[in-house]
Amino acid sequence: MKYFLILLFLNMIFTKNYNLSELINIALEKSPQIKLANEDKKISLSHSIEARSAALPRIQFVTSATRNYNVAGQPIDFPIPFGVLNPVTGDPIPTEWNPGLQETEIIPYETMFSMGRDYSGLYGININQTIFDGRVFAGIRASNKFKNLTNASYDSQKEEIIENTKISFYTVLLTKKVTEVFHKSLKRSKDNLFNTKLLYDSGKTNELELIRAESMVKDQETTYSNAKKNEILALEKLKLTIGFNLSQNLNIVGAFKDSIQIIPEFNEISNQLLAQQPRIKQLEANHDLLQEDVNSYLSEFLPSIELTGSIHKFQSQNKDNFTWKNFQDNSSLSINIGLPLFNGFGSTARIMRAKANAKKAYYHSEDLKNNLLLDLRNIHLSLIEANEKINAGNKKLELASRGYNIANDLFLTGMTTQLELLGAEVSLNRAELNLLQAKYEFQIALVKLSRAIGKNTTGNTK
């Protein structure tokens, strides 16, 4: 038990405090979404390499060896010249006018002729090079578009992770501030109970006021306990968001920003959205990729040209003559040209389908732009509203604080009741909470604005 307490104490001492930037770095390193996005980038790179490889020469080493155990004969008719042999008896047949010649005409004589040797061998290199193929070049262009699509998707995931991390961070910060508000309220309630007991003991107030003071303390204890619970849950949610170990302690440091003097104009941020928003880039890249599908199908009507070459060494010999020195050069070079003439309108149908898909992607992209601009308008108005709430909240908090001090002084002098002091306490708590809520809304609006205009990934070319 002693060692456990020592370890717990050391853990509390050496627990690191994390600011927002450090938490974002942790999220971008450990978040499952970013890991998936990184694997998608690797897949995109593999597609690019694969597409370009189709335009590179293909070089292959080949070798073969054959041992013929039985060589089949080929029947061939050989003619017997005049005056040589009788095809039946094999004896010479003289003529009347010349004993050295045959009487008959040329007579074919069938014999079996074996065309082959005991051993044959070949080794060498085959080379194939695409000179022109529209589908190959369309594939290379498509791989570049796919790379742009993957990068935009990665940036979109990154924007979402950063936004979720910031929202979780400021939610924890809000719950910590709320806990502080109710802790101060509980302390004021306890001080009020102490003063009320003194007044009651001196006969300056009645028992009902004492009961109200005790009830106020119990109410504030319950509220404070609930606030601490919400703070713990918000912190656990932050750990899950950034991929932090739930068993480790996590302390955050930071503060809400006060209202800013100048809020950017809507036209300015709308232009930034259209130029930088990863989701728009993602759909535009998808449209470009589908447009390359159209080009790929159009290339089916174009000719293809391929160059083929071979550099071989070959020999075919019987066993005694099969040696390295008998290998002979056997090289060739050829060019192959293919020109499509008719394929049953299949290519035409594929082109129609590809064009329709490309148009759908374009319409989807335009619709997304309009929706994002509408969301941006909402964010911009929320930013203005939250800014005004902060300015008003600061004034209300100042008035509520003065009101509570006045009510407390009047109660101590017996000039007011516990109910009026309780009302002042509630007003002070409400003013503090409303100001915190306004600051939180302002901060969240800034977070959403950053994601809307793609601020977190601006200039990212990875």
What is each PLM-predicted segment?
Residues 36-51, 157, 161-180, 198, ...:
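Amphipathic alpha-helical coiled-coil segments
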Residues 35, 59-73, 111-118, 128-156, ...:
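Small/polar (Gly/Ser/Thr/Ala-rich) solvent-exposed segments
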Residues 22, 46, 152-272, 382, ...:
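Periplasmic alpha-helical coiled-coil/stalk elements that build and connect Gram-negative outer-membrane
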Residues 62-125, 253-263, 295, 308-339, ...:
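Small/polar, glycine/serine/threonine/aspartate-rich low-complexity segments that form flexible
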Residues 124-126, 169, 270, 334-336, ...:
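Membrane-embedded beta-strand positions in outer-membrane beta-barrel channels/transporters
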Residues 14-73, 246-288, 340-341, 369, ...:
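Bacterial Sec-pathway N-terminal export signals of envelope proteins
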Residues 3-12:
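Sec-dependent N-terminal signal peptides
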